[in-house]
Amino acid sequence: MDQLDQLSDYFPPPLPVGQTLFDWGKRTYVMGILNTTPDSFSDGGEFNSLPTAIHQAKTMVQGGAHIIDIGGQSTRPGAETVSLKEELERTIPIIQALRQELDIPISIDTTRAEVARQALQAGADMVNDISGATFEPEILAVAAQHKAPIILMHIRGNPQTMQNLTDYGDLIGEMRQFFSAQVDLARHYGVLPEQIILDPGIGFAKTAEQNITLLRQLPELKRLGFPLLVGPSRKSFIGKILDQPDPKERVWGTGATCCRAIAGGADIVRVHDVEAMAQICKVADALWR
């Protein structure tokens, strides 16, 4: 029996993060994306100065965001890795400034333990690791030390190689195995089960068809007993369905995807277009919760 089978009947208790209590199952929480990068796939270069980043964060809060997710390293397919120094310079000043002005939970989107450590010291509340702690497992020790929730995403390879690693015999079964190993590792490092959130990793080492399959079978991952974060925002599989090459024109396709995710048990949706998605989530919650 693997780690997750042992926890299959575990229902996550409410999670306090800063001044917010996340009461799982009662509503969908909206995570607003704040990329401070010049090369993110849909908003690169728009918010990589302190004034524009702060303005965008406040706009997202006014639009209904419950979490602001700050990232200084693009994770689009083929993205090059920036230096540790550059990633810190892109994120830490913004976290420090936002912490002075907003009470909302702040998430640091990073795969590096040192970035996570400095971000949490600067005022971030949680860690969002798109590698699921496979790049730098010591990031789990940082989260445990700070008693910070951590989001573990499913991926194969890295942003340079992941789209060549989409050959699955059993997509959901292999994702379960991945999460089993990473949850076990997180607990080994001292992360409490109630501080773990899982992300199936839409668009990461998955084809368009596999992303659709994943969304259809999301309840199978919900059965693992952990809160689920789903990040479909403006992704290329939506563009393929809509024949829409411009990521910013995929808003309503993103909305439809969020509805499917919520019906399948998603607890958090990670999105660019916060105001529109917050309204969609409210209606979806009224229908399915």
UniProtKB/Swiss-Prot annotation:
A single cellular component GO annotation: cytosol
Alphabetical keyword list: Folate biosynthesis, Magnesium, Metal-binding, Transferase
InterPro entries, per database record: DHP_synth-like, DHP_synth_dom, Dihydropteroate_synth-like_sf, Pterin-binding_dom
Pfam families: Pterin_bind (PF00809)
Gene name, Swiss-Prot/TrEMBL: folP
Pathway: Cofactor biosynthesis; tetrahydrofolate biosynthesis; 7,8-dihydrofolate from 2-amino-4-hydroxy-6-hydroxymethyl-7,8-dihydropteridine diphosphate and 4-aminobenzoate: step 1/2
Primary role: Catalyzes the condensation of para-aminobenzoate (pABA) with 6-hydroxymethyl-7,8-dihydropterin diphosphate (DHPt-PP) to form 7,8-dihydropteroate (H2Pte), the immediate precursor of folate derivatives.
Gene Ontology molecular function, alphabetical: dihydropteroate synthase activity; metal ion binding
KW tRNA processing (keyword) present: no
Reported cofactor(s): Mg(2+)
Stated name of the protein: Dihydropteroate synthase
Gene3D superfamilies hit by this protein: Dihydropteroate synthase-like
The species this protein was found in: Synechocystis sp. (strain ATCC 27184 / PCC 6803 / Kazusa)
Record domain Pterin-binding: where: 28-282
Keyword Metal-binding: yes
PROSITE patterns registered for this protein in UniProt: DHPS_1 (PS00792), DHPS_2 (PS00793), PTERIN_BINDING (PS50972)
